[in-house]
């Protein structure tokens, strides 16, 4: 089984639709403790940028408890020790096809790898495949990294003093985006399985 999964990963990483793939998993309610642990590791400065205010542990806990994994979509990147090093939350509005709001966090140890941009692209593809018209980002103006990701993706940014809103218009879904979404999920699941097997073999879990 391992050899077949490894063969799939080699073929997948060479797929023309998905260059330089980062394995991004769709997270479920069972991953809630991992999401909480990830967010609690953020420094005060990172919490301020992620939430727009200096969220304490209790506020972060309430945020995680209220995450609706059925309505919204939560994505995560795991390192080889299955630690959640980056995650994104794509929250859908009252009218799901109208808009969706994106938020992301990356641990300091995983910065500079382009994970924020990868998560943004993944969320955009999922939103597009659900016929969402606009993906929105609410950020502080000092969150230059997040705003740069949005601008590079073609978003329109409106500034309001110390805050900013970015709006990315999404095209209609297409056959290749739906295929890419399925392939990415299969790749991420296979990658996670191999990491889990590696940990078991090395007595880490």
Walk through the language-model features, giving the residues of each:
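A short beta-loop-alpha structural element at the N-terminal edge
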Residues: 22-34
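Structured alpha-helical
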Residues: 83-85, 130, 149
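Helix-loop element at the rim of GNAT/NAT acetyltransferase active sites that forms part
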Residues: 37-52
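Acetyl-CoA-dependent GNAT
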Residues: 52-98, 107
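Terminal substrate-recognition subdomain of acyl/acetyltransferases
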Residues: 1-22, 138-205
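Conserved acetyl-CoA-binding loop-helix of GNAT-fold acetyltransferases
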Residues: 106, 112-127, 134-136, 148-152
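A short, internal acetyl-CoA/4′-phosphopantetheine-binding micro-motif in the GNAT/acyltransferase core
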Residues: 78, 103-112, 140
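Residues that cap or delimit alpha-helices
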Residues: 28, 43-44, 68
